[in-house]
């Protein structure tokens, strides 16, 4: 079978990126079908309506392109492998990234297996802004061409084997080009806005949503000097570097500079704050990461120079990485970095290549 006669199942989300991905693959001669994944069905309110609208859009695009759309329900897998872990991390006072977990457990595991075993696919494809390159018989994950939209940060857990079975057609394009293709084709998704926030929360208020699953425990807000200046409604609602939603103004003797969360004392349920976004307590010289995933799946030993992102929209930080043991590394930044947050992911790069990453276990504070 020639490469292009191979069967590709495109994860159709009802958005513009997956819509254009399906068309691009058709143009390349692949045998294309779509799959709409339902990953959440805990409530049938607003999210149900959004999912129904997304499915209708995905169906309209598939009809327009003349391809079959399959549907599958991964809600049980999502609950067990993504959502419960998400809640456990929040409960422990950390700030997880469910998109990374969803890609790891659902889109590139459950979907990949379902497409291959049930639908006879040679490849899956998604609308992610990343690229793939095959070097020395191994697939590598590269940043998307559009640096504003690059999503490699969210896909660092993928192995070279998973990448070898995945296609990323829009990774070679910039977002405005993708929208233009969709407009020229008259696709209903052409002007649809990009989804933001956590998929299972949608447009709902985060506090309200989280409060349904985890009991909030109010506690003290204290300054780095130990003064009590307010009450928080629950540590899980706050993340390092946050300034909005603290409900505190300046102190009588202090400046009017805004307050930022600089630490959480989970054991005593205390939120620690300081004034100024570059307060020393907010800065870190490095971090310890665990639960490592290297794209090439080779164990990392010794040290290396590379760059790291400790959150999605961040400029690359030059750093030195040192192996501590099989599943832990120490990362030392060239310059101190603000708001390094336990539970989030540290993702490593060598130029355009995403090497892999891990979960931030602890940050290394500035020496006092």
UniProtKB/Swiss-Prot annotation:
Binding site for ATP: 11-18, 37, 127
Gene3D superfamilies: Adenine nucleotide alpha hydrolases-like domains (2.30.30.280), HUPs (3.40.50.620), Translation factors (2.40.30.10)
Cystine bridges: 102-199
Signal peptide: none
Keyword Nucleotidyltransferase set for record: no
Recorded GO CC terms: cytoplasm
Stretch list, region Interaction with tRNA: 149-151, 311-312
Location within or outside the cell: Cytoplasm
Swiss-Prot/TrEMBL keywords: ATP-binding, Cytoplasm, Disulfide bond, Nucleotide-binding, RNA-binding, Transferase, tRNA processing, tRNA-binding
One Pfam family in the UniProt entry: tRNA_Me_trans_C
GO molecular function: ATP binding; tRNA binding; tRNA-uridine 2-sulfurtransferase activity
Site (Interaction with tRNA): 128, 344
Keyword Phosphoprotein applies: no
Known EC number: 2.8.1.13
Assembly notes: Interacts with TusE.
Annotated protein name in UniProt: tRNA-specific 2-thiouridylase MnmA
Species of the source: Shigella dysenteriae serotype 1 (strain Sd197)
């Amino acid at each position: 079978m020639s490469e292009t006669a191979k069967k590709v199942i495109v994860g159709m989300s009802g958005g513009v990126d997956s819509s254009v991905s399906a068309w691009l693959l058709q143009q390349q001669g692949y045998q294309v079908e779509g799959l709409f994944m339902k990953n959440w069905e805990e409530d049938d309110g607003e999210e149900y309506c959004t999912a129904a609208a997304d499915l209708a859009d995905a169906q309209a695009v598939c009809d327009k392109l003349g391809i079959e759309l399959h549907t599958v329900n991964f809600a049980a897998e999502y609950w067990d492998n993504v959502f419960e872990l998400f809640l456990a991390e929040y409960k422990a006072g950390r700030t997880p990234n469910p998109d990374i977990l969803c890609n790891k457990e659902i889109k590139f595991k459950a979907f990949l297996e379902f497409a291959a075993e049930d639908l006879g696919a040679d490849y899956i494809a998604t609308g992610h802004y990343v690229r793939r390159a095959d070097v020395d018989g191994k697939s590598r994950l590269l940043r998307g061409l559009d640096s504003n939209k690059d999503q490699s940060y969210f896909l660092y857990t993928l192995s070279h084997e998973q990448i070898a079975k995945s296609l990323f057609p829009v990774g070679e394009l910039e977002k405005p080009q993708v929208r233009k293709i969709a407009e020229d084709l008259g696709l209903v998704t052409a002007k649809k806005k990009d989804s933001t926030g956590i998929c299972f929360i949608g447009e709902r208020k985060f506090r309200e949503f989280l409060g349904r699953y985890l009991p909030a425990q109010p506690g003290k807000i204290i300054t780095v000097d130990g003064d009590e200046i307010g009450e928080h409604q629950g540590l899980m609602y706050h993340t390092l570097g946050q300034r909005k939603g603290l409900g505190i103004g300046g102190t009588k003797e202090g400046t009017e500079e805004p307050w930022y969360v600089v630490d959480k004392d989970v054991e005593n349920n205390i939120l620690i704050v300081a004034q100024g976004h570059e307060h020393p307590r907010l800065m870190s010289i490095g971090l310890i990461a665990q639960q490592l995933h290297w794209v090439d799946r080779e164990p990392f030993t010794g040290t290396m120079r590379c760059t790291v992102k400790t959150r999605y929209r961040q400029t690359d930080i030059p750093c030195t990485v040192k192996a501590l043991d099989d599943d832990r590394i120490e990362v030392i930044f060239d310059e101190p970095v603000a708001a390094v947050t336990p539970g989030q992911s540290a993702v490593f790069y060598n130029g355009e290549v995403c090497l892999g990453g891990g979960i931030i276990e602890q940050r290394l504070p500035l020496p006092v």
